[in-house]
Curated annotation (Swiss-Prot):
Keywords, comma-separated and alphabetical: Cytoplasm
Primary localization class, coarse: cytoplasm
Membership in a protein family: Belongs to the RecX family.
InterPro entries for this protein: RecX_HTH_1st (IPR053926), RecX_HTH_2nd (IPR053924), RecX_HTH_3rd (IPR053925), Regulatory_RecX (IPR003783), WH-like_DNA-bd_sf (IPR036388)
Main function: Modulates RecA activity.
Any one Gene Ontology cellular component term annotated for this protein: cytoplasm
Taxonomic superkingdom: Bacteria
Name of this protein: Regulatory protein RecX
BP terms from Gene Ontology: regulation of DNA repair
Length: 165
């Protein structure tokens, strides 16, 4: 007995895959390209195939037309999400660039976001080290290292102490 369903084209399988990927969360164009470039799954090893660049381009273009793929929207949402998790602008910018977002798109997304990075740095420091922030030099250095690791700029970190001394 043979399989009665006809084999779907690589393009339609790629389109389905893109929709499943984008249904989970927003992705940058580079992330989606990378994920679509992997081997298309099949029922068995003979049916697995590599997606062609032309099919990937068509799927990416279709996703842009349908507004499912938008790097600017992705950057805005990513900044908001990572900011809520306590990461600073420097680290978020680096992560966005690793995900294929251009420097100009990053700059415009950060300009549009309404996050007070200095206040957020203060909140993170107080959450980690307690409400009256440490005043001795070794403890201040510890706070600075923590906030630098989280991706805050040194100006924001210094402003925490400057504004409350």
């Amino acid at each position: 007995m043979t399989d009665a369903t006809p084999r779907r084209s690589a393009y339609s399988r790629l389109l389905d895959r893109a929709m499943r990927i984008l249904a989970m969360r927003d992705h940058s164009e580079q992330e989606l390209r990378r994920k679509l470039g992997a081997v298309l799954p099949g029922k068995n090893e003979e049916e697995q195939e590599q997606a062609t660049p032309e099919d990937i381009e068509k799927v990416i273009a279709w996703c842009h037309e349908q507004h499912y793929l938008d790097d600017a929207r992705f950057a805005e949402r990513y900044i908001a999400s990572r900011g809520r998790k306590g990461y600073g602008p420097q680290r978020i910018r680096q992560e966005l660039q690793q995900k294929g977002i251009s420097r100009n798109a990053c700059d415009s997304a950060f300009a549009d976001c309404e996050v007070d990075w200095e206040q957020q740095a203060r909140d993170q420091a107080e959450r980690k080290f307690g409400a009256p922030l440490p005043r001795t030099f070794p403890e201040k250095a510890k706070v600075q290292r923590f906030l630098l690791y989280r991706g805050y700029y040194m100006e924001d970190i210094q402003a925490i102490y400057r504004n409350f001394e």
